[in-house]
Amino acid sequence: MHIRLATESDVPAILSLIHALAVYEREPDAVQLGEAELRRDGFGTQPLFECLIADDEGEAAGFALYFPIYSTWRGPSIHLADLFVQPSHRSRGIGKALLERVAAIAMERGCGRLQWDVLDWNTPAIDFYRSRGAVMLESWRIMRVTGAALARLAKSSSPGT
């Protein structure tokens, strides 16, 4: 098994892993993008994300999808959107290797922070992250606007402001 940067040819495997993660996270119908969007957003002229693949003899055993963000407190940072290992490949250090590689990339890029979200019921993941030095920010909550609410909010904007 080795960790490598994903290429455009990995898009079908990445999408499959995203769907598997959605099932694990109890939201099997939440994924609304397809291969075309992943190709455009990750492998186009201005990539919005990067992805690592845990390659086990040609099989995508897991992945880590991340992107740059900016912290007004810490400067350049990375947000880890997804970290997932196929159930058949767990307990072999793959998740640890993926997380460590993303952390190394953050350090190489001079980032002051690596952050991600975790579901409150996902105690195996919480324990895994805590065992690697992560701290749960109990007082922070995620706010999100999607779909019609996003369109309404955008429509409220005055031109030129």
Give names to the regions the model predicted.
Residues 1-9, 150-161:
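Conserved N-terminal entry element of GNAT/NAT acetyltransferase domains
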Residues 130, 139-150, 154:
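Acyl-donor-binding surface of acyltransferase catalytic domains
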Residues 107-117:
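Conserved GNAT acetyl-CoA-binding A-motif
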Residues 85, 91-104, 131:
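Conserved acetyl-CoA-binding loop-helix of GNAT-fold acetyltransferases
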Residues 81, 86, 119:
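Residue-level recognition of the GNAT/N-acetyltransferase active site
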Residues 116-125, 144-148:
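Conserved beta-strand-loop-alpha-helix junction that forms the acyl-donor binding cleft
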Residues 5-12, 16-79, 99-100, 105, ...:
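Acetyl-CoA-dependent GNAT
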Residues 66, 129-130:
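Conserved active-site tyrosine of GNAT-family acetyltransferases
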